[in-house]
């Protein structure tokens, strides 16, 4: 039987050792009472390491680096504060690689912290808000500590847990964290309209996170029998399922089911997913599997970027010298869409950020996605289909979707650069 922990007498130093690496569910799956206690007790434990995903709380702050070494696969959310303070190291991994890194021990996870939904009548716990890379960590961690949260949604997935899987349990009753709604600007809405015009009825969608994916979902209300296979599921998915737009009726696998790895939204998606067999959470080994993605007909992958150069190279990691994004799952999904029958690999972004063009002659950060994987690039000014295009043809296409105020400057910069395309 697992040890029963008490919130007012919680001593994690009995379970966590100096030198350990600790992992927990990202975003709204964070077991907040456990992670907060971990940071408060860090000096008592001794130096250890934390592997972060998207951070929707400020549980981990730069001052905690006095004892804690932070690493993450992304700079999203509150991770940006750690990165800007020089307190965060980045794991530049494709999302599909994370389970293998954990299982092989290349990314050793000693302690796993989970937020679970209460046990059912059979004594089985749902993983609640996230599956993702938590399953391989569950199989390899020395210690598994669970917050069993009375308000966590009970979701369907590939695995449930019993007491034998857990070393310690803390019972709580609190609202899970939520994602605030993204602010959709005019440029986002125009981009969404372009993308919606590319999507056929019966297509299966993968969406990244942020204003553009939310705007795209809002622009699809006139479509029929859409499906979803994505890394994350948000409020827009719940709303389109309730409206009968997303039915998953034409998917050639997981028919009738929206598949994702994590719920990334507000109480809207949490409540909708609760005890709902039409939503299933799966491990990253399934959601990002290249063969699974390729097998989905009309698979449309829609992801964002910091900037794209005139030949189709994509920087999804660094903006203005700060690590704000990730290698993440974009390339996994884009390659899946390229292999899918009737698939569409889409990168979408506004043409500008303030006074600066996001269509650039040369990237100001790494080439997260190489130009050999370029598909369709969409801004508010149109669609550049780079598939099968030569470098010169790509430049022409990309200039047409750049902001008109920057087109002449981009041409001048390209001509001034002595290196070939």
Stretch-by-stretch model annotation:
Residues 1-421:
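Conserved alpha/beta enzyme-core scaffold
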